Amino acid sequence: MTFTPTDYNAYDFANRRHIGPSPSEMEEMLRVVGVSSLDQLIEETVPASIRQDQPLDWAPLAEHELLQKMREVAAKNRVMVSLIGQGYYGTVTPPAIQRNILENPAWYTAYTPYQPEIAQGRLEALLNYQTMVADLTGLPVANASLLDEATAAAEAMTMAERASKSKARAFFVDADCHPQTIAVIRTRAEPLGIEVIVGHPAQLVPEDVFGALFQYPGTYGLVRDFTREIAALHEAKALAIVATDLLALCLLKEPGAMGADIAIGSSQRFGVPMGYGGPHAAFMSCRDELKRSMPGRLVGVSVDARGNKAYRLALQTREQHIRREKATSNVCTAQALLAVMASFYAVFHGPKGLRHIAERVHLNTVRLAQALKEAGARVSPEAFFDTITVEVGVGQAGILAAARHRGINLRKVGRDRVGISLDETTDAGVIARVLDAFGIHDPAPASVGLGFPEAMLRESAYLSHPVFDMNRAESEMMRYMRRLSDRDLALDRAMIPLGSCTMKLNAAAEMMPITWPEFATLHPFAPPEQAAGYTEAIRDLSDRLCRITGYDAMSMQPNSGAQGEYAGLLTILAYHRARGEGQRTICLIPMSAHGTNPASAQMAGMKVVVVKSAPNGDVDLDDFRDKAAAAGDRLAACMITYPSTHGVFEETVRDVCRITHEHGGQVYIDGANMNAMVGLVQPGAIGGDVSHLNLHKTFAIPHGGGGPGMGPIGVKAHLAPYLPGHPETGGPLAGGQIVATHEGPVSAAPYGSASILLISWAYCLMMGGEGLTQATRVAILNANYVAARLRGAYDVLFMGNRGRVAHECILDTRPFAEAGVTVDDIAKRLIDNGFHAPTMSWPVPGTLMVEPTESETKAEIDRFITALLAIREEIRAVEAGEIAAADSPLRHAPHTVEDLVADWDRNYPREQGCFPPGAFRVDKYWPPVGRVDNAWGDRNLVCICPPVESYSIAAQ
């Protein structure tokens, strides 16, 4: 017998692990689509005029090779004890939370909870987060997270401008705020025409401002009561914002007790590693009357069809995707996964545990301050929580170096001071090393008391809801987390076919490095030489993304796709100003654009001019040409999505770019649909000047149930000098390098949520250039297969000139309205089959947009198709008069276990209602609640944990 080695490669990650359909299954799918090969399908789908010539050519790494490379890169980072503070602190992530939340795909692969019936677990966890924030800040309403503390401060400023009755156009910022917060506020204020006044609170003139931001405790440690300043602001009809620290509020008087209108901050030190800048969940809370002006997601309590308590996203008409160019915020993806971690940290420790941690941190700081004072050092401030500043004169460099020699980073403050911020991880050994750096080797025992006046001690209770006390034992904590995750539908259970969302595989090997200490524990403002591994990773990822997109430089700072849009538009405006063309402020945006596009343009101070869509869904070229000509020398940019939001490669994209350039504008190509382009089309080569990339879509960062995300922007060379900079680095950042000194930051950290960039880097390395291209091709195949199978049962809207869709397709459900069947009915019925609904009513009302990513197997796609075909038959029964829509399984969906076991009095069989075609029988997903009453929830708004007795609430 002759031995013949197999040609099967067990380590081929792209084809064996990431891409779902096998080669033989692809052949079957191609036959259904009506082509002989994948090459033919791509030729019929992607216009030849835009296809790239040069292939992506780097070789792939196997999983074990990837992890070995990651270990080598991680070793180049130097793990130090960072006592820099400035909004970032060492913290202990309880292993129960790391293993059961952060490393659990049931939590990290879920989508934003727009379908509440299949998101009750994470909605409860986010409601716990809101309750935690509301309790600790002393304000009644809190949102479910924002991107970072600096962004939250900027959002609070614009919120105050909307809500304030003051006629002033200036905003006061306490000079004791974190420098990165001040910088981001300046960035946000400038295009909106808001004057930013930075000064000491004693310099505040309330009549001159519409609002003020105070830091509590201050960036240099000061704890002070702002009650008097806040009262003066209110007298002048202005609003008061307090940037605060949740751990400090376990001891200190809460902002609400001072009269604050809005509180913001970061929940990072509640168990979320620093990660060289993120991701972390920022928070915002406010007075009740301001809740409708609050940006971000807001979880509320409602009831389902049986009157059972149910959670949902409340007041959604506030959000940018609905308000579009009238929006005042573009917040979309936030930081849900990190908010969930922080909420479980509070559940894990409870109010007593949190107070103990806060006391320990504070008393250690008192001991350190006393030891320094007794040795003759000049320590400030007099009132502090965890941060002190030491005057060291000309010895500053020596002290900083001595501390680093002992494995500790201190903060450089001015030219003659050193800042020290202690945290949960600080122990006696760390304190001894700090003192040793100051030449204090045998400190006298210190008497320990409060480091701030007793009048500043918190008097009110917090976290009194039983959820923060009943899970003390880890066994109960583990079961609680499991119960919540079992209520949700994430990628670990089924495909999530959301159009324009790209819910692809988030491979375990890609996720592993983010929890390694060499990556997780780095402070974003640590000396650059301590982050050589991060620098290498960021530069290499930037280089690969530039090769993929055809751009020349990449900024990794934006913390979300929407923030990337905003940063890209600011870059364009800065370019125009530098050329003496500051009058260019008009932005042309197709009416089918993502809702964040017009919202981002409005935030950048642009005037949005909406361009019509042609009947086939393309940009109406005649209308575009006319509006570009009308704008003339006022045209700043156009924003288009490619492939279009209608899921088609438009043939006229080069014409749109050419017309824009002829009138002196810049072309912004939204990268939300980049999953249909990687390896096939480079936006920078077809006329784009700038694009953002949704790394949480195309490049495998998980959605986390509503964040984290990353939205880096790629630009052509002429725009590179105008990329976002940062006060800690001194200039715009491109691929880990400073390229010039021009624009301010859009995020708190220089590289945004740096730790999750590792996921996209790992994805690119394991896929290789050929694998990335094949993933794009298979994504297009999967979408065309779905369209071909469903055509006839559903009308498929918008196809290219040769009858092909890109990576997603739009199903028209509007004809069913005559029979009384809504798109919502179809979405809820899919839950009975164990599926998340496709994107509903966007970009066309009354439609479903389906995106089956390349990671989905043919079997799973067929199961989804079976479900939709069965639903179509149920619609036909309604159309034929066999059953009324109100009595059909469509209207009663989703069906719960409670429905299954109750007396059955419905006009269809129990089997049909609860076990429709396509649904698993043994491992069936059962939604924990029936259809949620959205209107009830908004009429009876409750955004904190309801009392225990209300858990049996019944609809009135």
From Swiss-Prot:
InterPro entries given for it?
Answer: GcvP, GDC-P_C, GDC-P_N, GDC_P, PyrdxlP-dep_Trfase, PyrdxlP-dep_Trfase_major, PyrdxlP-dep_Trfase_small
Whom does it interact with, and what assembly results?
Answer: The glycine cleavage system is composed of four proteins: P, T, L and H.
Keyword Oxidoreductase among UniProt keywords: yes
Q: What class of enzyme is it?
A: oxidoreductase
Q: Which domain of life is it from?
A: Bacteria
- What keywords would UniProt list here? Oxidoreductase, Pyridoxal phosphate
**What is catalyzed by this enzyme?**
N(6)-[(R)-lipoyl]-L-lysyl-[glycine-cleavage complex H protein] + glycine + H(+) = N(6)-[(R)-S(8)-aminomethyldihydrolipoyl]-L-lysyl-[glycine-cleavage complex H protein] + CO2
Role description: The glycine cleavage system catalyzes the degradation of glycine. The P protein binds the alpha-amino group of glycine through its pyridoxal phosphate cofactor; CO(2) is released and the remaining methylamine moiety is then transferred to the lipoamide cofactor of the H protein.
Documented EC number(s): 1.4.4.2
Task: Give the gene symbol.
Answer: gcvP
Q: Name one GO cellular component term.
A: cytosol
Cofactor(s) essential for the protein? pyridoxal 5'-phosphate
Gene Ontology molecular function: any one: glycine dehydrogenase (decarboxylating) activity
For the keyword Oxidoreductase, the answer is yes
- SUPFAM superfamilies this protein is in? PLP-dependent transferases
What protein family does this chain belong to?
A: Belongs to the GcvP family.
Q: Which organism is it from?
A: Cereibacter sphaeroides (strain ATCC 17025 / ATH 2.4.3)
Which protein is depicted?
Glycine dehydrogenase (decarboxylating)
Write down which residues bear the modification named N6-(pyridoxal phosphate)lysine: K697
What Gene Ontology biological process does one annotation of this record name?
A: glycine decarboxylation via glycine cleavage system
